[in-house]
Amino acid sequence: AMEALKGTKRESTTFGKVDVVVYPGVMLVNNVTYKLYKAAFELQPAVEMQLWKGASLRLQVCLPIVNNEPGKWDCIRLGYLTLRQEFRLDNHWKGYLTGGNFSDDRQGLAAGIGYFSSDGRWTVEGEGGITGSSHLYGNDWGMSKWKRVNGQLSVGYFIPQVNTQLKVSGGRFIYGDYGVCGILSRYFGEYVVGLYGMYTDGETNAGFHFSIPLPGKKRSRHAVRVMLPDYFAFQYDMRSGNEFARRALGVSYRTEPKSAENSRFWQPDYIRYCLIRTNEKTKLK
């Protein structure tokens, strides 16, 4: 498909055009004994800009709306503050390099590379980074040296008959523990639901995740657009027992919002399935 596009005349470009994306943020955790749940809801607007080919800039701030947990959730603070470069090495290889302020109060450098089979069903991916802590609560911005090294290797397979993706990964988390994780994700059109399980340093964890499409995908390309993200994604961690949380096991970070990752799900069998479904619905009208 990429070869067929070579030499095609460019109709428009996203260079220099700005998106103001208003991400909803939800926190729901039950790893404390003094209340049933820690919960928070906030808006996380981000200024996003496409630079040169494969490069993007994201500047995000987190605005608290309501919560039942004092501390960071009461403060206006930085979200993602990143410069990201994506690249394609060959038809089957792609990767990224990014630096800046990530999720989970981390900042540093991270990189990843992945191999994708010809039919897109098999994937082998590796990623890692070196980070330090980054806390900006009110007027106090605390940072530490970049000394925490993490990395993981994952293998995934997409089962087209049931539109399900299986992924198994293993590696080193932020605070030095090693573990493995298995994820099962089922796709229903643009909706995704899934389960995961993790084992690290003698402790277990599990949970579920889902992703739902948000309205407003049909947009005109103006110099500045204000919009919602394409998807709202959420993951709930069970964290069995207090030991998992006390020892900060299985802690990782994201270099971009989860909904941004969902927007790039390009598995060929799944795209074909969605196109066939769309065509069938059109014929019935």
Predicted segments with their positions:
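Flexible, glycine-rich linker and terminal segments associated
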Residues: 1-9, 123, 143-144, 150, ...
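Outer-membrane beta-barrel initiation region
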Residues: 1-83, 144, 277-285
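Short loop/turn motifs that connect adjacent beta-strands in outer-membrane beta-barrel proteins
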Residues: 10-19, 52-58, 88-94, 118-124, ...
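Transmembrane beta-strand segments that form the barrel wall of outer-membrane beta-barrel proteins
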Residues: 20-33, 57-67, 83-85, 90-102, ...
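Solvent-exposed loop/turn segments connecting transmembrane beta-strands
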Residues: 31-40, 51-53, 65-78, 99-109, ...
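Feature captures outer-membrane beta-barrel proteins of Gram-negative bacteria and organelles
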Residues: 41-52, 75-89, 109-128, 149-159, ...
